[in-house]
C-alpha cells in the first residue's frame, strides 16, 4: 500500500513538473509585443529604433577574435590596430570562410537591415509621436540601413540588395537565395538612400551632445563621400583581378574598365561635406 501511495505521489509530482515546464515557455504577459502593439506606443517605437542602432560597431570590438573582427578594405585609412587579433589570424593563415569574423558581420548586418526596413514601414503607425518626430526617426533608420549596406560592401564587395520589404519569416528557400548586385548598383543604392535622408529635412544638421551617436546630416554626407572614395579606388574601379566574380547568369559584378569620373564625384562629395561640416563647427585635426 505504501509503495502504491509512493507511486501515486511520484506520478502527481511529474505531472506538476510537466505543467510547470509548459507554463515556463509560455509568453510572459506584458513583455512580448507584436508589431501593432510595438508601434502603437511612442516609447516602444523609440526602443525599436534604438535596437536598430545597436548593430553599429566600433573598432575596439576587434579586440576579441570571436567578435566581428576588423579586416576592412580601407587599410590606408584605419590601418592595423595592435589589439586586432584578426590581423594576426589573417597573416598566419588561420583566417578562412568559416571564421566567425567572416560570417558574423554578414548575418548581423542583414538582421539590422531587416529591422530598419520593418521600422521604416511601420513607424507612421505611431500616432503617439508627432509627425516631425516620426519623420526624424524614419530618416535615421534609412541612414542606418544605408550604413549597414556600406559596411557589407566594404567587407564583402558586391552584395545582395534586399529592397524596401524585409524578407518574411516564413519565406521559402528560393525567396531567401538572392543574387548579388553589382558594385555600381550597390553604390548607387546606398548613395541614393543617404541623399534621401539628407534631403528629407527631418534629420538634425549636427546631432550634438544631447543626441550623440544619432544619424545626422553631417554623418550622412561624410559617409556618402567615403562611399564614393571606395567606388573610385582601384579596388572597385576597373579591378581586372575580380573579372571572374560573376553571378550564375554571367552578370559582371566588378566594373572592368576604370571610370575616372568617379574620382571627380568623390572629390566633389568631400568638398560638399567639408564645406557643410565647417559651417557646423567641425574642423580638421591639427597635428603639430
Regions found by a protein language model. Name each.
Residues 171-185, 258-262, 267:
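Structural transition elements
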Residues 63-79, 162-165, 202-219, 235-288:
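Short, surface-exposed recognition loops and adjoining beta-strand edges that mediate ligand/DNA contacts
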Residues 46-60, 64, 81-156, 174-212:
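Conserved, well-structured interaction surfaces
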Residues 1-30:
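Bacterial Sec-dependent N-terminal signal peptides
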Residues 221-227:
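TPR/Sel1-like alpha-solenoid repeat signature
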Residues 21-70, 246, 287-288:
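Membrane-proximal, proline-rich intrinsically disordered regions
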Residues 153-154, 160, 230-239:
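Short coil/turn linking the two alpha-helices of tandem helical-hairpin repeats
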